Amino acid sequence: MAGFGLPNFGQLTEAFKKAKEIQQNAQKLQDELESMEIEGKSDDEMIKVWISGNQLPLRVEVNENISTANKEEIEKNILEAIKKAHESSTTTMKERMNDLTGGLNLNLPGLDNNDS
């Protein structure tokens, strides 16, 4: 520590370099997540959904044999597929953020860094 409780200039410079590096890598990660397609499907594979790494819905595929299912079963399958895609997307995003920050606990909103 330098005088007056301030870190020395070298430490401060390194901290700024690290922050800039994280910022640049965060933009790359954002672009990567945006271009990802993560699939979720119902257990019977009648419904498949894809969402981006940013958790935006991309598309839905319905098996042509679904017409034999009743309304409640179809609704259950849709919800199941969405939940699985969302869970995979969330896990992927957390893993990539953890890689980006080198395990630093940044307490970013929406990302519980202690889940990993």
UniProtKB/Swiss-Prot annotation:
Biased composition annotated in UniProt, kind: Low complexity: 99-116
Keywords: Cytoplasm, DNA-binding
Region (Disordered): 87-116
Biased composition (Basic and acidic residues): 87-98
GO cellular component assignments: bacterial nucleoid; cytosol
Role, per record: Binds to DNA and alters its conformation. May be involved in regulation of gene expression, nucleoid organization and DNA protection.
UniProt xrefs under NCBIfam families: DNA_YbaB_EbfC (TIGR00103)
PANTHER family: NUCLEOID-ASSOCIATED PROTEIN YBAB
Subunit structure: Homodimer.
Name used for this protein in its record: Nucleoid-associated protein PMM0020
Natural source organism: Prochlorococcus marinus subsp. pastoris (strain CCMP1986 / NIES-2087 / MED4)
Lineage: Bacteria, Bacillati, Cyanobacteriota, Cyanophyceae, Synechococcales
